[in-house]
Amino acid sequence: MSEIIQDLSLEDVLGDRFGRYSKYIIQERALPDVRDGLKPVQRRILYAMYSSGNTHDKNFRKSAKTVGDVIGQYHPHGDFSVYKAMVRLSQDWKLRHVLIEMHGNNGSIDNDPPAAMRYTEAKLSLLAEELLRDINKETVSFIPNYDDTTLEPMVLPSRFPNLLVNGSTGISAGYATDIPPHNLAEVIQATLKYIDNPDITVNQLMKYIKGPDFPTGGIIQGIDGIKKAYESGKGRIIVRSKVEEETLRNGRKQLIITEIPYEVNKSSLVKRIDELRADKKVDGIVEVRDETDRTGLRIAIELKKDVNSESIKNYLYKNSDLQISYNFNMVAISDGRPKLMGIRQIIDSYLNHQIEVVANRTKFELDNAEKRMHIVEGLIKALSILDKVIELIRSSKNKRDAKENLIEVFEFTEEQAEAIVMLQLYRLTNTDIVALEGEHKELEALIKQLRHILDNHDALLNVIKEELNEIKKKFKSERLSLIEAEIEEIKIDKEVMVPSEEVILSMTRHGYIKRTSIRSFNASGVEDIGLKDGDSLLKHQEVNTQDTVLVFTNKGRYLFIPVHKLADIRWKELGQHVSQIVPIEEDEVVINVFNEKDFNTDAFYVFATQNGMIKKSTVPLFKTTRFNKPLIATKVKENDDLISVMRFEKDQLITVITNKGMSLTYNTSELSDTGLRAAGVKSINLKAEDFVVMTEGVSENDTILMATQRGSLKRISFKILQVAKRAQRGITLLKELKKNPHRIVAAHVVTGEHSQYTLYSKSNEEHGLINDIHKSEQYTNGSFIVDTDDFGEVIDMYIS
């Protein structure tokens, strides 16, 4: 044989070969046939077991024998893949109705591997034989196997709609399928209604076939998703576990899971829930136990006393496979091609297959009945001239001669003559003559009935309906999955996710934030906080891990940070910079921080800028679900900075102090509530080149402490302040000097909580007691504290 060498481009060869491969795995491996709901390997397994007599009424046989038969005759692939497919057909948590019964370890819902095939035994289930019934009556086409040594069926007769009953899942080149299992009785009832009315709508079909019926039970939510899937082949539903509540003797409650979503690994689910408990992602779970035994699936989740079990359940629905979404993708092979099919198309394809199967079976039975009728007529004729027939046979030389003589003398046909010469003597009694005449009548009636079925389409459909009803009556079972119309919205209480713990929140002027246990704080003291050189504590307070921190910056933005998301860091150690939690700009600095326990409050924030703008916004506006980026708190115009954020429970007085020593005091009731993106209104009427250095709440018992650039501190009492209206110029608090005038660089309202001050110059920090600063009159410049000739001008002041 001479070689033929072709020059082909690699691109063409790869494209051609991959196209062939794709077609093969689509048609011959991964996708089920719409007619019998089986993939090729599943079909070959069932047929091999049936043809070898490994049926439900016989003894179990070693699985290895079946696997050997399949790969030897029909499926030349690895034995493991065949055994794996065989095992799946026996798993009652995968199939709604198992097609193979298996003795031995056939795996588990924990995804444990089955025992080796040499240890397990199997046989066809009774229902599986309904897929194969009448296969020997020329009902389906056969094709040569892979080595042309025998024949295998292209499809099984499938006397019930197996694709819908047991569903299918698979992935091939460019296609995937996910068809859920359904209740057999419901599917058959829907098929019967479709036979009666081929124009039946999906809505009408759904009166009979309610939705998927998973072997693992569970609760299905979302009728709209089911309807969409039944109409188009694609849809989405929610499947959640069945969870009940029990009360233990000690008064604690426990959640008992008895049904889990389809295809969920039970051991992985238990492990996941226990991880959520161990990692303290959910507070309130004491222990998770897998109590599954021979009586059924059971997972126990023991809860702490007085916890909200409904919230725990909702958290687990959202954060574990206690609830999953199932996506329909009903792709099957139809007319040799993969198609996305709705439920009407699937039932229609199945019905057309059954029409063909029943018609072929009827033709086969009619042919056999007519052949038998012909033989019976010959036997009856022979018995009517028995003596002559016997005499002719006795005078014949041999069997062949006898047959030829019968045909020639009495005009019997070849088939009739063969039956006569094979007739045994004991059959020549009167009883057998009567039996033959009775059989003749029965055959006449049968032939008439079979011809009627072939000639009358309605009669053929009635046969299909009768046989489907028989299967329904024999194999029907109660629905396992409960269907709920709406998808329930999951609401999770924060208390469930986060253990309640009182901690110390701290923020430094350079933006380092942390939470610290009260134990660590008490062991160290405020002064021992971990700081970088040049940094100082801006604020510290006791908060709860279930609170939320709002961090406000000079750009008019705020960061929304749940306290429990802050790193738990010892008091003596450096905190975490806010930019590592939420990204902020390089020149963006923190100006204040507050914690909120409940955003449902009448409290409000007041924002004041350097250029004299002010606004008020209620606390509920700041609640959000976005943690990953800064959010707008107030609009800050170009060349301006937010310098003050205050939180008030009710309207009160605020004082504004400017760089040139002007002061204006008015009530926040003059401010209207505005949205977060508003810029606000004018707070004070500034002089040229003046700017605001302080805006803070003030009361009658407070004093004001001011620092000037020349190192002077001035302290005044509340009575010097004159309450006025917003947007006025205000009063003067400094004595104006022609040469080197004092300018206020920092000011703070001093309350009973404050006792110390710190002045910052370019190269020095000066600490002192606030009470050592005597109260001044309105038109003075205070007392010199810092020698600016030695340490430079004062740039800031901090009180504590």
From Swiss-Prot:
Q: Where is this site: Interaction with DNA?
A: 39, 75, 77, 88, 94
Question: Which residues are annotated as active site?
Answer: 119
According to its record, how does it sit in the membrane?
Answer: Peripheral membrane protein
A Gene Ontology biological process term: DNA topological change
Entry GO MF terms = ATP binding; DNA binding; DNA negative supercoiling activity
- Would I find Oxidoreductase among this entry's keywords? no
Identify which top EC class this enzyme belongs to.
isomerase
Intracellular or extracellular location(s): Cell membrane
For this UniProt entry, what is the primary localization, expressed as one broad class? membrane
- Alphabetical keyword list: Antibiotic resistance, Cell membrane, DNA-binding, Isomerase, Membrane, Topoisomerase
Q: Which family does it belong to?
A: Belongs to the type II topoisomerase GyrA/ParC subunit family. ParC type 2 subfamily.
Q: How does it assemble?
A: Heterotetramer composed of ParC and ParE.
The UniProt entry, under NCBIfam families, shows: parC_Gpos, PRK05561.1
Q: What is this protein called?
A: DNA topoisomerase 4 subunit A
Taxonomic source organism: Staphylococcus aureus
Question: Lineage, please?
Answer: Bacteria, Bacillati, Bacillota, Bacilli, Bacillales
